[in-house]
């Protein structure tokens, strides 16, 4: 299972056009996508946050590691679900399409794979903070998935990709900021 997750993450990042076509043909169920791809990736990010705090700080602080992993878990899960929900609403409101939350959960999950992979690397190796710029590559991943996976026409593709990328990238960040503001004990 973990090899398959790793292969899909690499495929989506390195060859998004080909990966989206394969994912569209695969036609997997929502539960399968979530339990075999998204949830394990969020688990990896959470474990990376825990280990990153334990091994990259000068002091060995278990409490701080638990706080970091809780904040990461809540912001990743919340960002994923809130992003899918918001895009489902925008899908109907702005793009005049029929709501399909299951489709959006899969699309946001696969589109977030670069963000999850970067979070894992940056939590374990914080010295490579400059890699954060590659998060903008999510725009291209969403662009390639808009046609084959979501069936978006060329004339509205740019607007679709702009909305989707902004929501995928901003919802976890907003939730993390809100958590830090509402619960100052989670800030460090």
Regions found by a protein language model. Give the residues of each.
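Transmembrane helix-loop junctions in multi-pass membrane proteins
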Residues: 50-63, 118-126, 174-179
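Selected alpha-helical membrane-embedding segments in polytopic membrane proteins
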Residues: 2-99
């Amino acid at each position: 299972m973990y090899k398959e997750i790793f292969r899909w993450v690499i495929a989506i990042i390195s060859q998004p056009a080909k990966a989206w076509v394969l994912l569209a043909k695969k036609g997997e169920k929502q539960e399968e996508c979530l339990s075999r791809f998204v949830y394990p990736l969020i688990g990896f990010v959470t474990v990376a946050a825990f280990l990153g705090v334990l091994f990259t700080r000068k002091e060995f602080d278990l409490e701080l590691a638990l706080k970091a992993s809780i904040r990461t878990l809540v912001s990743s899960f919340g960002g994923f679900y809130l992003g899918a929900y918001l895009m489902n609403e925008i899908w109907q409101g702005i793009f005049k399409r029929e709501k399909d939350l299951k489709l959006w959960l899969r699309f946001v999950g696969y589109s977030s794979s670069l963000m999850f992979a970067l979070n894992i690397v940056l939590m374990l190796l914080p010295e490579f903070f400059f890699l954060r710029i590659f998060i903008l590559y999510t725009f291209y991943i969403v662009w390639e998935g808009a046609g084959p996976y979501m069936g978006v026409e060329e004339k509205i593709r740019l607007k679709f990709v702009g909305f989707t990328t902004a929501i995928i990238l901003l919802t976890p960040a907003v939730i993390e900021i809100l958590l830090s503001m509402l619960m100052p004990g989670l800030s460090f």
